[in-house]
């Protein structure tokens, strides 16, 4: 494949934007390949400005659960645009999407719309602190909750240490109110609560970690979180920005049967437009302005285009949708294991609904430490060879791949064959 136009576009972009991009992963640095500039998408396919076609497993990092340019979404967006893009006042579309979310998500009795997943998690933590009157938040190593200061934290050397900033510009004073413990480790969480329990406002977790690859919870982990937070009077917060409506019809919380106090949503809820949301029990949500004194606002929150895209996306998802994802996922997982075994290359495949992650190690992978043992050099080689075969994968070991309703068995079989061909070139 040729990337002449993409390379030329990147040279210009680098003079205009830091690193030439508006989000770091788009620079493709971790796979040591030129950034690709996309032109358009349709169904399960995406096309770059050089005219190359790919089967797309990135799907805009998860939102496009119906694939690209879904006819129903696009048609209703045209109708919404004809009425205006934003009004600075409420519309009936907000009611429609809010009601649908409340009907589908077990923990949500009231919901507040925002414009991004980062906003959703940031506002949720403010609400948790304001509601409980406590300061500290517990997060898990390897879980990403957006780029707000208090969540850009890495673990120290201890089991349950106060956080250190993971980025310059994050004051240590903010970091000290974030406690980081290993994912899937209830013993570490218990130690954190024994030390700081009286000042822990809440525990925030991706019910399926999606930013260290795809790492599902081990049996009993989520219920353990529910039990411990209840015991100490802290709030359990599910960050379902990625898992929401991907893992199941009732999100991850419905799939696993564990109900948090607060839930953050994003990605799929916007169907490809900028949307986030957070919600939970009425008694907690009513503390937000204008009913309560915990402030939150947004100029474009609940804008009609985003509400339209979100509603028309979610309204097409049914329980049968997730049966289809499971069928495609079974085929892909079995094919990956078969092909990698054929070439004597170790692989660990983790799945949750339409989220799939593969690690180039023996496994298991249940936490960030184990995820980091994946062969990153081989992953980069694999990425480059798969792109040559017309398969667009996330250019990072620590991002998951996604399925859409537009993907077909033929797409999956072509992808498995592409892995076989790629490995034939890599493994001599």
UniProtKB/Swiss-Prot annotation:
Enzyme class: isomerase
Keyword set, alphabetical order: Cytoplasm, Isomerase, Porphyrin biosynthesis, Pyridoxal phosphate
EC numbers on record: 5.4.3.8
Annotated family: Belongs to the class-III pyridoxal-phosphate-dependent aminotransferase family. HemL subfamily.
Modified residues (N6-(pyridoxal phosphate)lysine): 267
GO molecular function per UniProt: glutamate-1-semialdehyde 2,1-aminomutase activity; pyridoxal phosphate binding; transaminase activity
Keyword Protease: no
The name this protein goes by in its record: Glutamate-1-semialdehyde 2,1-aminomutase 1
Biological process annotations from GO: protoporphyrinogen IX biosynthetic process
Cofactor: pyridoxal 5'-phosphate
Assembly, per entry: Homodimer.
InterPro entries from the UniProt entry: 4pyrrol_synth_GluAld_NH2Trfase, Aminotrans_3, Aminotrans_3_PPA_site, PyrdxlP-dep_Trfase, PyrdxlP-dep_Trfase_major, PyrdxlP-dep_Trfase_small
Subcellular location: Cytoplasm
Reactions listed under catalytic activity: (S)-4-amino-5-oxopentanoate = 5-aminolevulinate
Domain of life from the UniProt record: Bacteria
A single Gene Ontology CC term: cytoplasm
Signal peptide (residue range): none
């Amino acid at each position: 494949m040729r990337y002449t136009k993409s390379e030329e576009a990147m040279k210009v972009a680098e003079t205009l934007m830091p690193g030439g991009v508006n989000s770091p992963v788009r620079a493709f640095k971790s796979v040591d390949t030129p950034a690709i500039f996309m032109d358009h998408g349709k169904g399960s396919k995406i096309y770059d400005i050089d005219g190359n076609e790919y089967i797309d497993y990135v799907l805009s990092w998860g939102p496009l659960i119906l694939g690209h340019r879904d006819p129903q979404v696009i048609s209703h967006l045209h109708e919404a645009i004809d009425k205006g893009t934003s009004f600075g006042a409420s519309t009936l579309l907000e009611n429609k999407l809010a009601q649908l979310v409340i009907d589908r998500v077990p923990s949500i009795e009231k919901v507040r719309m925002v414009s991004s997943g980062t906003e959703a998690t940031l506002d949720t933590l403010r609400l948790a602190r304001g509601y409980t009157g406590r300061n500290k938040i517990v997060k898990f190593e390897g879980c990403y909750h957006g780029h707000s200061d208090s969540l850009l934290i890495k673990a120290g050397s201890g089991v349950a240490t106060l956080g250190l900033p993971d980025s310059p510009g994050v004051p240590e004073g903010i970091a000290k109110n974030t406690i980081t413990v290993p994912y899937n480790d209830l013993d570490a969480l218990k130690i954190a609560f024994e030390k700081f329990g009286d000042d822990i406002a809440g525990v925030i977790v991706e019910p399926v970690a999606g930013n260290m690859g795809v790492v599902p919870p081990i049996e009993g982990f989520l219920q353990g979180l529910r039990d411990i937070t209840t015991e100490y009077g802290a709030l359990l917060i599910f960050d379902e920005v990625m898992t929401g409506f991907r893992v199941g019809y009732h999100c991850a919380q419905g799939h696993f049967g564990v109900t948090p106090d607060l839930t953050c949503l994003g990605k799929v809820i916007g169907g490809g437009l900028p949307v986030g949301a957070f919600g939970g029990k009425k008694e907690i949500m009513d503390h937000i302005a204008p009913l309560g004194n915990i402030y939150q606002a947004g100029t474009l929150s609940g804008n009609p285009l985003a509400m339209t895209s979100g509603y028309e996306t979610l309204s097409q998802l049914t329980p049968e949708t997730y049966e289809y994802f499971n069928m495609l996922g079974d085929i892909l997982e079995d094919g990956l294991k078969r092909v990698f075994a054929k070439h004597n290359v170790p692989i660990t495949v983790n799945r949750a609904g339409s989220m799939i992650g593969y690690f180039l190690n023996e496994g298991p992978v249940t936490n960030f430490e184990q995820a980091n043992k994946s062969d990153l050099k081989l992953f980069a080689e694999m990425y480059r060879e798969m792109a040559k075969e017309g398969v667009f994968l996330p250019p990072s070991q620590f991002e998951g791949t996604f399925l859409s309703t537009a993907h077909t068995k033929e797409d999956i079989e072509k992808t498995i064959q592409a892995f076989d061909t790629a490995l034939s070139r890599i493994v001599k």
